[in-house]
């Protein structure tokens, strides 16, 4: 590289480093862009002189560089333009110029060609046309640059351009769905991200309007408030993106888990642990994109309407204050929301009641939103407003859209201060994927879908139950309040009771309705906890659950709320196995509450009699049956449900000395039930778990039982890896049975290290602290309940079983609750040694070391 270029490159590096250092001191986004852009232009000037001095070509900044928005690791978008088609010699010159840019590590993105060629290239290329919309002359022949801009502007169909940009935005938003996009969002392309702000300004510029916010205020396009909010949202997002590039040292626009703590710390979120820093950063991010979405929803249709051909307007009178324009509602006088604030809710009420109205007319929306910022205590205390707000839930129609609309524009947070505290609050607990406010509204949506015939095919039984439930509005409110106390510290279910009762008192609910609402908020985790963590075959578990529930109405409401909550937490959590757990508990509790629970001994006897009846119908002699029951022992009927007993008995009654393996595909699910019967021996349970994990199965539940003649009868429910289609299940079943049969007959089976499979990036960088509790069972001496919470990973259950074995603890039952990347496992174990506090402490320490 020539000496003059080496000097220019060194100057550039110094200016770039100075710009970054200055930014880290001041956090002024606009100053960084100006200084960094100037540094790049200084280097480009030297390179241009070296390659194209006295040329008819010109160099233009396009795209992000053109608008002066250059991030630390962004591409430098350029265009080399010629008044005439490029000759071979000029093309070679341009190639050398581009290579020099790469040598300088500028990451160039360069378009080149003659004026006509470039105009033709972007005619049907919306991305290229957009890049040149922001073209800015740098060096060379200015006349060439002016001619290119003139021709491109002349050929651009503004209405078609705007339509294409809006379609592009829809597609971009559609790609930003799913858990990954929520947890590790792309700050540039997500809904409400930087690209949405750019789109708004492109639509304005294509119409010949200004592209800076103060000028748009002067032109009457934006109000000062709107410009201020949009500017604030933009600065927040740009601030995060600059820090993201600086920490990643690459053009990374996703807020990846491993980068979130680094970005948060460099932005000044100090004095907090890494998880809290990340949560605070993400909350700032979600609030910023919410502001952008608010303004985009108002300004985009307004800007579009300036140039789009107006369709036939169908105007209908609604009442003295409102008219319907096509599918939108418009206020006759937009100052009505300031003069009569009760209309803030009234217009929403009308929109909810009318299926033919889907939106507020843009000018009406703008005025309505401006008035919502006046919502205060006086507005809340107005009984008309309270009646209308409660009416949104009583009506039910369009409830989800109504609440999401009110949340998007900040009305829920202004009306209910408790709601404002959860807006954008993300939980790094390895299974929630939505901010708390989005999660709550998704749960409301799920409850509402159960009430609609059109969605009955999704969950037929739950839908029928919901559609016969008398007080659906209380269920909607329970969904709305169930997590409203998140983020305050302490038990959010208990803290939420006060919010729910205050709302009920203020919004004219009866005492009975208030009691049901408060009970559901307090106990919204009860059913999922019992179903997923406890052994509902144990009569004492069912008895304790029903004492909490007390009535069939509460049971039905809790069942419906629990289903909706799990489905609204993370799409990965809802599966046929969880559905069956909840349904089993629901029906068992229903029978109990109806007086059919019976005493435990009668229940166990009934289970044995059902199995005996089955064997008698199969012509099994009574003498043979008694031999089987004696081998299994009386405790067997206390620890297994009827369906398992019937299955075991049919397979064991003729021979309960020979080891066997049996499996069956559970109906309407992606799971197998597997039974293993063989002589007892060391580490058998752990080794069986390793076989399942080696095949990629998730163990959902496991029951370890030792017969009177010292055989193990272990029963597992395992989930088939998601990449397999149902038609593959029989082959998978055969392969699994073959390996298990080899194992029970003494053949060596290869064991794989617990750490041979990696855990996810989220689990690595946002781990949860493992916790362990060991509690003695009240009615069973030497029996203990062990509760473990940890990051989920392959071989977790096998490793726990190994530690139990090493500490002379006999594992008898395991209930595995896998919540995406979080494991909440419950074990029932037998060990007289655990009476000794030192041994119990040693066990706990060993488990913690394995989970760390």
From Swiss-Prot:
Family annotation (Pfam families): GlnD_UR_UTase, HD
Annotated spans, Uridylyl-removing: 319-672
GO biological process, one term: regulation of nitrogen utilization
EC number: 2.7.7.59, 3.1.4.-
Signal sequence region: none
Cofactor: Mg(2+)
Domain ACT intervals: 673-757, 785-852
GO MF annotations, alphabetized: [protein-PII] uridylyltransferase activity; phosphoric diester hydrolase activity
Location of the region described as Uridylyltransferase in the Swiss-Prot/TrEMBL record: 1-318
Keywords: Hydrolase, Magnesium, Multifunctional enzyme, Nucleotidyltransferase, Repeat, Transferase
InterPro entries: ACT-like_dom_sf, ACT_dom, HD/PDEase_dom, HD_domain, NT_sf, PII_UdlTrfase/GS_AdlTrfase, UTase/UR
SMART domains, per database record: HDc
Catalysed reactions listed for this entry: [protein-PII]-L-tyrosine + UTP = [protein-PII]-uridylyl-L-tyrosine + diphosphate; [protein-PII]-uridylyl-L-tyrosine + H2O = [protein-PII]-L-tyrosine + UMP + H(+)
Activity modulation comment: Uridylyltransferase (UTase) activity is inhibited by glutamine, while glutamine activates uridylyl-removing (UR) activity.
CDD domains: ACT_ACR-UUR-like_2, ACT_UUR-like_1, HDc, NT_GlnE_GlnD_like
HD domain residues: 436-558
Domain notes: Has four distinct domains: an N-terminal nucleotidyltransferase (NT) domain responsible for UTase activity, a central HD domain that encodes UR activity, and two C-terminal ACT domains that seem to have a role in glutamine sensing.
Record function comment: Modifies, by uridylylation and deuridylylation, the PII regulatory proteins (GlnB and homologs), in response to the nitrogen status of the cell that GlnD senses through the glutamine level. Under low glutamine levels, catalyzes the conversion of the PII proteins and UTP to PII-UMP and PPi, while under higher glutamine levels, GlnD hydrolyzes PII-UMP to PII and UMP (deuridylylation). Thus, controls uridylylation state and activity of the PII proteins, and plays an important role in the regulation of nitrogen assimilation and metabolism.
Family: Belongs to the GlnD family.
HAMAP family: PII_uridylyl_transf (MF_00277)
Name of the protein in its database record: Bifunctional uridylyltransferase/uridylyl-removing enzyme
Native source organism of the sequence: Neisseria meningitidis serogroup C / serotype 2a (strain ATCC 700532 / DSM 15464 / FAM18)
Name of encoding gene: glnD
